[in-house]
Each structure stands twice: as structure tokens, then as C-alpha cells.
A protein has these predicted regions:
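Extracytoplasmic/secreted cell-surface and envelope-processing proteins
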Residues: 38-40, 63-64, 86-92, 133-138, ...
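Active-site-proximal C-terminal subdomain of hydrolase catalytic domains
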Residues: 127-289
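Residue-level detector of extended alpha-helical repeat arrays and alpha-solenoid scaffolds
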Residues: 335, 371-374, 402-406, 433-435, ...
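A short, glycine/acidic-enriched catalytic loop
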Residues: 84-118, 130-132, 137, 146-148
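Buried hydrophobic core positions in alpha-solenoid tandem helical repeats
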Residues: 322, 357-361, 389-395, 421-425, ...
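Bacterial N-terminal signal peptides
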Residues: 6-17
Length: 549
């Protein structure tokens, strides 16, 4: 009996030791959206009895992060491998659909729907460019200062207010990651260009040869690791704490993405923000827009949301402040965004929204110099031609020097008389006018064969090689399929005065409908009349290979 008890006690002891060993394992979570080199290197050097690896990315499943949350995965260490552009981690491989938006990281960090994923993190390793870059992002401080001055504030006071708002709201990548990985002791990343996967793997190998694997997951920054990656600008920080000066800002940001809040509750919070000074509302504009765009139809129809939206729509003082700020803005894209948002918030009917957009277009025409960005904006706003019916209310400003930009805006609004003048500018010598025409044609491409043939004929008669290249490059984007136009351009090739013009012609043919091309004739023209160049294997060679394939 004593022997059996001893055996049983020994067995229980072994089981307890095994259980404790298993429990003591640190969980290394990996998010691999590009290179697996870094993950594989960590796996190679970290002992299996102390570390277990969990890949969070499920290939072909877009909601893989939410899936990891539902499985109650708890990470001690997180390794993220992917290119980073400030808003998402992504892959360089065209056949890969996996990516990690910063917005989803914010949601996981702020929401109780994913309490475990980041809650016990001790270390984060981000292998992506600029993940911990400390330079602040795009600032609206100058724009806000100008608005405040126009509203009657002194220049000094306006600059003081805009600086304070910028300090609170303008984030660097480093600030954003500290806000996401709240309370995490160590967060590694790169202040500039990160090494590619294979190079990073080699550096990690050298680190593991010189350091104990126990450093990983210790929650303490490794001087050895930072030293190994010093030439690549690796740096380390810690996640935000409750005592951090920006903790209050994090609380407000989380209100936009916290899954525990209903859309009605989030809208009520937005209503509070819209009651603040408009210069601060401006700083929240991106997040308010993102929330409005994310709503499903069922969420919009929910009784609680309808009531919250009705309360906001009837807040006339907030409405007037918002629209006054929009109309006063000297940034047309911002004004357009605010008009669109005012409609979504119930402050503008469909008719009133159209009225505001028409007023914006009229102000651009009357405001003097019109840029290609202004043309792009108006064409985008009238993508569905909803403003065409009110074209008669738009009046071009007499004596405007920039006739082509004004014509482009009018043409975007459906003016049939302005369109030929814009197309005429495409073959002119004024590079700015050509750029305007190019932007216009991105929105209103040539579909009429007669128009295409007329433009192609004028391009063939141009004498300025640089201007001719600009016009030809525009035609290339139209994917020409008209035989007569292509024949005109084929006849131009032998008469071209520069290699650049010939290459631009080749650029049209390489994108053209090959059914409309006499391949043998074109190959003969290319071979016989090609100008000599020191460059090898250019677009003309690529065209020849394709024609002879």
C-alpha cells in the first residue's frame, strides 16, 4: 500500500512539474504579412520547452485578428513582420491579401471584445519601416491658424491655439504605437528604413549567438539587440501608462473604436465633440468621417441610433458653427469633406448638400488661380453627374487668365462647350494646361471615336518634343482601340525627332487593343525607323517582344 502511494505521489509530482513547465511557457504571437524570416529565426533560437509560437494570420481569412480574439489567445511576445506605411502593415507580394490596418490594432487595444490578445504583452517587435518614427504626422495647425485669424483672433493667439491643438492631436508613428500597446513594458521598432527579412534574420542570429534567449519576453529592453540593429535605426519605447500626458487623448480616441459601445453611444460622444470649438472639431474630423463611413444600414436604422442622430440634426448652433467653418476654409478638399459629412449627420438634405457643392465650385471659379487638384476635386464630386442639372447656375468669371482650368471645372460639371477647349489644351505647349487636361481626362476619358481621331491627328502635328511626349502619355492611359488613330500614331513613329517621343508612342501600342493593329507592319516600322539609343531593353524592345510572341 505504501509502495502504491509512493508511486502515485511520484506520478502526481511528475504531472505537476510537466503542468508547471507548460504553464511557464511564454506565448510568442506572430503576425506575418510579409517575410517569415524574422519569425523563423526567433523559433530557431528560442527553446521549445520555454516558448510556444502562435501565428495569428490565417491565410485567406480577412477577419483573422478578430478570430484570434475569439479564441482568447494571450500573447506574452508579439512579432509583426510587414512593410509599414503609417496606416497598415502590408505585403510586397501581389498574390497576398493579408494586411494589418492600424485601425484594427486600435480596435483590439480599445475594445473588451479582445481582452486577452494584448493584455499580458511584455514585448512587441515590429519589423517594418518607420514603425517607431518620432516625427509627427501631417499637421493642420497652419490651416487652423489661418482660419482663426480670419475669425478675428490675433495672429499670436491663433498660433498659440493651433500649436496646443497640434501637440494634443498630431501623432507620430511612435505616439500611435505607444497608444495601441498600452502598458507594454518594451516595444521595439525602427525610426527609419528597416532591414529586409533576410537581413533582419541574419542580424537576429548574431544577436542570439551573443545573448541569452531568456531576454526575450523579460519585459526589459535589450541593449545587445539594439546594438546589433543600431545601423538600421532600431529603437525601443514603452506603451502608454495611465499617468501619461496623452492618456486622456487615448480615452477619447478609444470612444470611436471601442466595440463595447453601440453606434448610438459613439454618435452621442461625437455630438459632444461637435459642441467644442471648431478648431478642435477639425482635429477629430478624420475619425468622425471614418465612423460615419463604417455604419451598416441596419445600424443606421436602429431606434437608438435614429434618436441620437435626430438629436444631433436638431442641434442648430452646432450645425451653424460647422457649416460656417466649412465655408470659411481655404482648403477646398476640406470644405468638400465637411459638406459631405454634414449630410451624413443630418445637417444637410440632398438638395442642400448639392447647393453647398455648387457654391464650392463657383467659389473656385471666382477665386483666381485654379490648380489641377481643384479640377480633380470638382470632377470627383460630380463623378455621378448629379450636379450636371444645375450647370446653368454656374457662371464662369470674366477675364480669368487660367481659361483651361476654368474650362476643365465647367466640363466636369457637364458643360459640353468647355470640353473641346480642354481637349485642345492637351496638344498645346503649356505644360500646366496639359496637366489640367490630363487630370480632367482621368475622370472624363475620351470615348467618342471622332474626338480620339481629332486628338491623335493634332498630336501627330506637334513640333515640341516635350509637349508631344506629355500628350502621348495621356493617350496611353486611354487604352486606344481605334484602328485609324493607331495608324496615325504608327505614321508618327518614323517622323519622331527624339527617342522619348518614340518610346511614348510605344507606350500607347503596348496598352492598345492588338486586334486593331497590323502586327507585322508595326514590327517593320519599329525596326526600320527606331532611333539609336545607348539604353538597352526599353519599352520599344518590350513592345517588339509582345508583338512577336
Amino acid at each position: 500500500m505504501a509502495t502504491k502511494s509512493a508511486v502515485l505521489l511520484g506520478l502526481l509530482t511528475v504531472l505537476c512539474v510537466v503542468a508547471q513547465a507548460h504553464a511557464a511557457k511564454s506565448t510568442v504571437c506572430t503576425i506575418t504579412v510579409n517575410s517569415a524570416d524574422e519569425k523563423q529565426t526567433f523559433r530557431r533560437y528560442l527553446p521549445e520547452d520555454k516558448y510556444q509560437f502562435v501565428e495569428l494570420v490565417e491565410r485567406g481569412r480577412p477577419d483573422w485578428l478578430a478570430s484570434a480574439c475569439r479564441q482568447h489567445v494571450k500573447c506574452d511576445v508579439l512579432i509583426i513582420s510587414g512593410h509599414f506605411n503609417g496606416t497598415e502593415f502590408f505585403s510586397e507580394h501581389l498574390d497576398s491579401n493579408e494586411f494589418l490596418p492600424v485601425a484594427e490594432m486600435e480596435r483590439a487595444s480599445c475594445s473588451n471584445s479582445c481582452p486577452g490578445l494584448f493584455s499580458q504583452l511584455k514585448e512587441v517587435y515590429m519589423f517594418g519601416c518607420n514603425t517607431l518614427n518620432a516625427e509627427a504626422g501631417i499637421s493642420a495647425s497652419a490651416e487652423i491658424a489661418r482660419t482663426l485669424v480670419r475669425a478675428g483672433r490675433s495672429k499670436a493667439d491663433a498660433e498659440r491655439v493651433s500649436r496646443a491643438l497640434n501637440a494634443r492631436h498630431s501623432e507620430s508613428n511612435k505616439d500611435g504605437m505607444r497608444r495601441i500597446f498600452v502598458n507594454v513594458p518594451v516595444v521595439y521598432g525602427f525610426s527609419s528604413v528597416a532591414p529586409v527579412g533576410a537581413v533582419a534574420a541574419g542580424t537576429l542570429s548574431r544577436y542570439f549567438h551573443s545573448a541569452s534567449s531568456a531576454e526575450v519576453g523579460s519585459g526589459r529592453p535589450s541593449a545587445r539587440l539594439l546594438s546589433q540593429f543600431s545601423t538600421n535605426g532600431m529603437t525601443a519605447t514603452s506603451g502608454m501608462r495611465a499617468s501619461d500626458p496623452r492618456a486622456g487623448y487615448r480615452q477619447e480616441v478609444c470612444q470611436f473604436v471601442d466595440d463595447r459601445l453601440t453606434p448610438a453611444q459613439t454618435l452621442a460622444f461625437i455630438h459632444q465633440i461637435l459642441g467644442r470649438d471648431m478648431s478642435e472639431v477639425r482635429m477629430f474630423l478624420d475619425r468622425i468621417e471614418s465612423f460615419a463611413a463604417s455604419l451598416t444600414e441596419s445600424e443606421r436604422q436602429a431606434p437608438t441610433f435614429v434618436r441620437a442622430l435626430d438629436e444631433l440634426a436638431n442641434d442648430l448652433p452646432a450645425r451653424e458653427r460647422f457649416l460656417a467653418f466649412a465655408r470659411d476654409s481655404d482648403e477646398p478638399p476640406l470644405r468638400a469633406r465637411m459638406i459631405k459629412l454634414a449630410h451624413k449627420l443630418g445637417w444637410l438634405s440632398v438638395e442642400a448638400e448639392r447647393e453647398e457643392l455648387l457654391r464650392l465650385a463657383q467659389d473656385l471659379l471666382a477665386g483666381g488661380r485654379i490648380s489641377s487638384a481643384d479640377v480633380d476635386l470638382v470632377c470627383s464630386l460630380n463623378r455621378d453627374h448629379t450636379l450636371d442639372a444645375d450647370l446653368r447656375r454656374i457662371r464662369p468669371t470674366p477675364g480669368v487668365d487660367d481659361a483651361v482650368p476654368a474650362d476643365a471645372i465647367l466640363a466636369c460639371l457637364g458643360n459640353v462647350d468647355a470640353r473641346p477647349r480642354v481637349l485642345q489644351a492637351l496638344t498645346g505647349a503649356n505644360s500646366e494646361a496639359v496637366q489640367i487636361a490630363q487630370v480632367y481626362l482621368q475622370h472624363r476619358p475620351i470615348a467618342d471615336v471622332g474626338e480620339l481621331r481629332s486628338v491623335a491627328a493634332r498630336v501627330a502635328q506637334m513640333t515640341d518634343p516635350d509637349a508631344q511626349v506629355r500628350a502621348l502619355n495621356t493617350l496611353a492611359g486611354l487604352y486606344v482601340s481605334d484602328r485609324e488613330s493607331l495608324d496615325e500614331l504608327m505614321r508618327l513613329f518614323p517622323n519622331a525627332r527624339s527617342v522619348s517621343v518614340q518610346r511614348a508612342i510605344a507606350g500607347i501600342f503596348i496598352r492598345a487593343d492588338y486586334k486593331a493593329i497590323d502586327r507585322d507592319e508595326l514590327v517593320g516600322v519599329l525596326r526600320q525607323h527606331r532611333l539609336r539609343s545607348i539604353d538597352r531593353d526599353d519599352i520599344i524592345d518590350a513592345l517588339l517582344r509582345r508583338l512577336q510572341a
